[in-house]
């Protein structure tokens, strides 16, 4: 009707769907590599393992991945592991060495060095300081439960 007022209704909650995990990646090899990382980040992953799962050369996959995502595969592995460690530190009382293990870090020292480098604080201080979980970019909910 002419002159009618607009009524805006705020959303009451957000529903996460499978499509929430979707990233627009044009190259199938890079997309496969990304999903391989998301599924296996808790295990020791070598770039050669990822390339082998895609059946192209390591060098070619590294180039495609960097072009598509703007970061290297190793940076993605570290990003996903760090995000998971942040969630564990924020939501559980697990010991730091267990957090490191469950997030895919080889040792608690590796976890500590990664936190210092990326977040400018250690895991213990992160937990005790009540820091918000940092925005480390897109991280699908499916990665949180991967490799369990």
Give, region by region, the residue ranges found by the protein language model.
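…primarily DNA-binding HTH/wHTH and HhH modules…
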Residues: 22-29, 35, 109-148
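Short hydrophobic/aromatic patches on the structural cores and recognition surfaces of FHA
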Residues: 61, 85, 111
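Short hydrophobic clusters on alpha-helical segments that form packing/core surfaces
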Residues: 33-37, 65, 69, 73, ...
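DNA-binding recognition helix and immediately preceding turn/loop
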Residues: 26-76, 92-103
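Flexible loop/turn connectors
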Residues: 1-22
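Terminal helix-turn-helix DNA-binding modules in bacterial transcription factors
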Residues: 48, 67-106, 129-148
């Amino acid at each position: 009707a002419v002159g009618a007022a607009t009524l805006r209704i705020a959303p009451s909650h957000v529903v996460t769907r499978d499509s929430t995990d979707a990233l627009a990646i044009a190259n199938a090899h890079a997309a496969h590599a990304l999903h391989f990382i998301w599924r296996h980040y808790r295990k020791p992953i070598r770039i050669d393992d990822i390339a082998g799962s895609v059946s192209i050369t390591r060098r070619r996959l590294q180039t495609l991945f960097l072009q598509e995502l703007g970061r290297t595969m190793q940076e993605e592995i570290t990003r996903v592991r760090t995000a998971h460690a942040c969630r564990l530190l924020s939501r559980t009382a697990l010991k730091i060495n267990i957090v490191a293990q469950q997030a895919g870090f080889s040792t608690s020292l590796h976890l500590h060095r990664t936190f210092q480098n990326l977040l400018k604080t250690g895991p213990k201080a992160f937990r005790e300081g009540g820091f918000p979980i940092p925005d480390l970019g897109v991280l699908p909910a499916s990665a949180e439960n991967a490799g369990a």
